[in-house]
Amino acid sequence: MAEQSDKAVKYYTLEEIQKHNNSKSTWLILHHKVYDLTKFLEEHPGGEEVLREQAGGDATENFEDVGHSTDARELSKTFIIGELHPDDRSKIAKPSETLITTVESNSSWWTNWVIPAISALVVSLMYHFYTSEN
């Protein structure tokens, strides 16, 4: 169900979702949307165990706590199979409104390792000059 705008929304009850809580069928809820992550288990950067622990339930708060990247959020959309039935939405805990934050970053990959590497080089040069003077 990649293009939900072309099709009617498929609703799943909480009871239906809870049945999909194993490695053969791994469903979870994020922001009232239902995701089938069975084929993504082995690819998940945090390991498949993290997803299996959340399977069959609402993982919204844990998903937001981790602080997933924009790319991860876009990728997650490809696994949407429907939505939690409106009658069941009150049965799950609402995530704290303060947890729903996204950080847009214009920094690229090099800031994650080049800046620390240069800093380490500067510190080692300072140490070398300091020890050579004594």
UniProtKB/Swiss-Prot annotation:
The chain crosses the membrane at residues 109-131. SUPFAM superfamilies: Cytochrome b5-like heme/steroid binding domain. One of its GO terms (cellular component) is intracellular membrane-bounded organelle. It comes from the Eukaryota. Keywords: Acetylation, Cytoplasm, Electron transport, Endoplasmic reticulum, Heme, Iron, Membrane, Metal-binding, Microsome, Transmembrane, Transmembrane helix, Transport. GO terms for molecular function: heme binding; metal ion binding. The modification N-acetylalanine is found at residue 2. The modification N6-acetyllysine is found at residues 7, 10, 19. The keyword Membrane applies. The keyword Transport applies. InterPro entries: Cyt_B5-like_heme/steroid-bd (IPR001199), Cyt_B5-like_heme/steroid_sf (IPR036400), Cyt_B5_heme-BS (IPR018506), Cytochrome_b5 (IPR050668). Residues 9-85 form the Cytochrome b5 heme-binding domain. Heme binds at residues 44, 68. PANTHER family: CYTOCHROME B5 (PTHR19359:SF154). Belongs to the cytochrome b5 family. Cytochrome b5 is a membrane-bound hemoprotein functioning as an electron carrier for several membrane-bound oxygenases. This is Cytochrome b5.
